[in-house]
Amino acid sequence: LVKDGEPMLNPNFLDMVRAAKSIGKIDRVETTTNGSKLGPGFNEALVDSGIDRIVLSIEGVTSERYLKFARVKFDFDAFVEKVRHLHSIKGDLKIHVKTVAQNLDYSIGEDKLFFDTFGPLADGIFIENTVSSWPQFAVEGAVHKDVDAYGRKTVHKDICPYLFYSLSVNADGIVSPCCVDWNRELAIGNLTEESIMDIWNGEKLRNLRHQHVHGGLATVPSCGSCGQVHACTHD
């Protein structure tokens, strides 16, 4: 339950989690959040909703870093305490914490501070590199396109694996084949008009898969310019 914005700003977020869990056919419900909504009261409701995993995406390890990168005044120490509280009541909830290397000052040990601070409070913890997914946007500090989010050499792909295991549903019901399609150039259906199974098995997505398999992703303008497929997907 996440795409282009902060999911927990949606007043119906917890209801969405409960609805998804009540179906009984979903392996995992998760979200990625900046964690600004966390705190006593909300934390209990979050755990009670049955959500399986949250990924906390943070902007640094001090209030000063947040002001520099996120341009907001942020009480970092208070945030850590809110995460600590969530961890203490989490039950089966998995908590992952990530940040990007470009937001840490390695010369003064902020990478170590990140691990020391969140390591005891998380089931998974990651420092990622910024990778440019969209040629329309300049990303300051992004690693070279031949290096992935973890500094490994990328393997060029001719077929995007997203097409065969995922869909991305926007807030208005428009369905894209992947989360990178932020401007919906590849819209393949609308849940207000047809079921998700009909879209998954539909002609538009089938044709897109065919283009990738037989011509390569470069034959699709939106896919050919994508950086994420090479740096952020598995074979």
Region locations from a protein language model:
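Short, acidic, Ser/Thr-enriched surface-loop or helix-capping motifs
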Residues: 170
